[in-house]
UniProtKB/Swiss-Prot annotation:
Family: Belongs to the complex I NdhN subunit family.
Domain of life according to the entry: Bacteria
Positions of disulphide bridges: none
Lineage: Bacteria, Bacillati, Cyanobacteriota, Cyanophyceae, Synechococcales
GO molecular function, one term: quinone binding
InterPro entries given in the database record: NAD(P)H-quinone_OxRdtase_su_N
The protein, known as: NAD(P)H-quinone oxidoreductase subunit N
HAMAP family, alphabetized: NDH1_NDH1N
Function noted in UniProt: NDH-1 shuttles electrons from an unknown electron donor, via FMN and iron-sulfur (Fe-S) centers, to quinones in the respiratory and/or the photosynthetic chain. The immediate electron acceptor for the enzyme in this species is believed to be plastoquinone. Couples the redox reaction to proton translocation, and thus conserves the redox energy in a proton gradient. Cyanobacterial NDH-1 also plays a role in inorganic carbon-concentration.
Subcellular location: Cellular thylakoid membrane
Principal EC category: translocase
Enzyme Commission number: 7.1.1.-
Length: 153
């Protein structure tokens, strides 16, 4: 298995496509090897879950507000009916400083809609230093394809 030894093929395809869909074995291990190989090649890596991502561009690059989950009937006296808004720093704020390329690895990518996945591809096109890897589910062996190719099927 030369891929697990070097990761060059994956890195080459990631650099050319910008946005990759990965199907990894459910036992785990393959994705962490690839992340380690990418870090060794000079990439900054950020691992995150795709659940609750919202608007990808705002969540990744801009300061944005979040609200607590709705917990049923509550008194309106403590705040607005929608709850208190808290400001959160962007996920990739610190990672995008400098000149190093950044890989965002999203777990549980199968919960994202087609429009959210295409928005991630557009982000990679607009910001050439950003590369996105989305885990789209499990497979018997590690395989990947460009996310645009997956969306066109």
């Amino acid at each position: 298995m030369p891929l697990l030894l070097s990761g060059r093929g994956f890195r080459r395809e990631l650099e050319s496509a910008g946005c990759m869909a990965v199907f990894a074995p459910l036992e785990g291990g393959a994705e962490t090897r690839l992340l380690r190989r990418l870090r060794g090649a000079g990439y900054r890596t950020q691992l995150s879950s795709a659940r609750g991502l919202g608007d990808p561009e705002v969540f990744l690059f801009q300061k944005h507000g979040i609200r607590p989950p709705h917990l049923g009937h509550q008194s309106v006296g403590r705040g607005a009916a929608v709850g208190e808004v808290q400001e959160v720093m962007p996920l990739l704020g610190e990672s995008m400083l400098g000149t190093k390329p950044v890989v965002l690895w999203l777990l549980e990518g199968q919960v994202l809609s087609r429009s959210e996945l295409s928005a991630l591809c557009d982000l990679c096109r607009r910001e050439p230093r950003l590369k996105v890897v989305v885990e789209m589910g499990g497979a018997r062996s590690l395989r990947w394809q460009p996310l645009k190719e997956l969306l066109s099927n």
